[in-house]
């Protein structure tokens, strides 16, 4: 697996570079600061953070490559046969929180796991996806996001986008609120049903599609005027983001349980957030429309080319 792991690592480092360059160019003011770190138990990474920009209030694009003698519970719970195997985990994970409430928060992740034991075949799989969390949503943005997702999946089979779109809707769901985190996208894990080269090609297609999915939405919305009321609603909805990441997100749990770097793991949290007791938007308002119309399991591409 050594050559394969090296190829995945080379791709992920290049993906991090390309995404950071594209986001810096779009912001026009802020620059990523890099923090290279080492994990005492094995491995390390490159954390890159950006903030206080013309566009991005806070964001990060992380690369990590960690390894150890046994998988943490979050990774082996649904695959108990892997308990006791040594592991390597590589990935790029990013979250972008724009200042303007009309520009959605975006998240993307692509990752590779390999669990090995002497005398046995290595067990490997890929995972990843991308999802969008709008505050003041627009249907054309949702359609564009999902169209890019569908087109990235298309060469790998007509059933791939619908399956991973539905998985995304299921995964990014706040059970205690009974509502989705955003308008979805793609999510998949344990991907090894194809041969390695095909799985790796799929991961590259998804990683490369993120900028194509996100930047046109950013460019359409970043100059939209906003007021303090809209910023307060954005902070309120960001609370849902925090709740999901700290309670349900498998990547966060894996990172914390495997002795990962806390600062990098919690990079995904927004800079300003608020909770109001039993707050509800005014009926018929833009804020109410988010939950009533957009935050629903919906086929955004129905009737679309």
Curated annotation (Swiss-Prot):
GO BP term, example: protoporphyrinogen IX biosynthetic process
Subcellular location: Cytoplasm
Family annotation (Gene3D superfamilies): Coproporphyrinogen III oxidase, aerobic (3.40.1500.10)
GO cellular component annotations of the record: cytoplasm
Site feature location: Important for dimerization: 176
Binding site for substrate: 93, 109-111, 259-261
Gene Ontology molecular-function annotations: coproporphyrinogen oxidase activity; metal ion binding; protein homodimerization activity
Cofactor(s) named in the record: a divalent metal cation
Metabolic or biological pathway, per its Swiss-Prot or TrEMBL entry: Porphyrin-containing compound metabolism; protoporphyrin-IX biosynthesis; protoporphyrinogen-IX from coproporphyrinogen-III (O2 route): step 1/1
Signal sequence annotation: none
InterPro entries listed in its UniProt record: Coprogen_oxidase_aer (IPR001260), Coprogen_oxidase_aer_sf (IPR036406), Coprogen_oxidase_CS (IPR018375)
SUPFAM superfamilies: Coproporphyrinogen III oxidase
HAMAP family to which the protein is assigned, alphabetical: Coprogen_oxidas
Name the record gives this protein: Oxygen-dependent coproporphyrinogen-III oxidase
Taxonomic placement: Bacteria, Pseudomonadati, Pseudomonadota, Gammaproteobacteria, Pseudomonadales
């Amino acid at each position: 697996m050594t050559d394969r792991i090296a190829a995945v690592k080379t791709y992920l480092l290049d993906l991090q570079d390309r995404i950071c360059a594209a986001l810096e160019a779009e912001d026009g003011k802020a620059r990523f600061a890099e923090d290279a770190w080492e994990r005492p138990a094995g491995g390390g990474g490159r954390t890159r953070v950006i903030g206080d920009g013309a566009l991005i209030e806070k964001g990060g694009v992380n690369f990590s490559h960690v390894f150890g003698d046994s998988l943490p519970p979050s990774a082996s719970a649904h695959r108990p046969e892997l308990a006791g195997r040594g592991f390597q985990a590589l990935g790029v994970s990013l979250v972008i929180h724009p200042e303007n409430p009309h520009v959605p928060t975006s998240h993307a992740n692509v990752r590779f796991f390999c669990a090995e034991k002497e005398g046995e075949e290595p067990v490997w799989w890929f995972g990843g996806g991308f999802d969008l969390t709008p505050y003041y949503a627009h249907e054309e943005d949702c359609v564009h996001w999902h169209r890019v997702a569908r087109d990235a999946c298309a060469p790998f089979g007509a059933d791939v986008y619908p399956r991973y779109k539905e998985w995304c809707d299921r995964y990014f769901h706040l059970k205690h609120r009974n509502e989705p985190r955003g308008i979805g996208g793609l999510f998949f894990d344990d991907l090894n049903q194809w041969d390695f080269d095909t799985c790796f090609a799929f991961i590259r297609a998804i990683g490369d599609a993120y900028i194509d999915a996100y930047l046109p939405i950013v460019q359409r919305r970043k100059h939209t005027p906003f007021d303090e009321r809209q910023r307060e609603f954005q902070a309120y909805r960001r609370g849902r983001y925090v709740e999901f990441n700290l309670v349900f997100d498998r990547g966060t749990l894996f990172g914390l349980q495997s002795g990962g770097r806390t600062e990098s793991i919690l990079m995904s949290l927004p800079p300003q957030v608020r909770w109001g007791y039993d707050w509800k938007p005014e009926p018929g308002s833009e804020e109410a429309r988010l939950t009533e119309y957009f935050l629903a399991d919906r086929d955004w591409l129905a009737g679309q080319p």
